[in-house]
Amino acid sequence: MSSEYRTGREGEFTYRGHTLDELQAMSLEDITALLPARQRRTIERGLTTEQQKLRETVRDADPQKTANDPIRTHLRDMPILPSFVEKTIAVYNGQSFERVRIEPEMIGHYLGEFQLTRTSVEHGQAGIGATRSSKFVPLK
């Protein structure tokens, strides 16, 4: 199975045969045609006003400024577009805003994919309120 993005011998990033500079020069309609089906449908149905506002904010932002003061958003369902590359966005995970630096390989994914909302639970030893059978731990 071939990858949709590659780095060539020179180390230049390509997404479906287009370099990053070409992608950033394209219109939204041209980029939409390259995206996977789910993201393409999201954009073709029309971005919400919040998503449009985020897109404009990220497009106009300076990459050096966003490194220190990231753009904060709750929009986990926003597809990552080429204009987002090299910017830092703080995505809300349900508890706090966590920084995500957008790399070229992230194009075509959703913002929420890079900030998990759940953590894996590692259970410790049985506590005071545990049942009698679960308290028993043989001494070694």
Curated annotation (Swiss-Prot):
TM stretches of this protein: none
Residue ranges of the region described as Disordered: 43-71
Disulphide connectivity of cysteines: none
Family statement drawn from the similarity comment of this UniProt entry: Belongs to the universal ribosomal protein uS19 family.
Composition bias, Basic and acidic residues: 52-63
GO cellular component, one term: cytosolic small ribosomal subunit
GO molecular function: rRNA binding; structural constituent of ribosome
Highest taxon, organism lineage: Archaea
Species: Haloquadratum walsbyi (strain DSM 16790 / HBSQ001)
Record's keyword terms, sorted: Ribonucleoprotein, Ribosomal protein, RNA-binding, rRNA-binding
Pfam assignment, any one: Ribosomal_S19
Record-level GO BP terms: ribosomal small subunit assembly; translation
Protein name: Small ribosomal subunit protein uS19
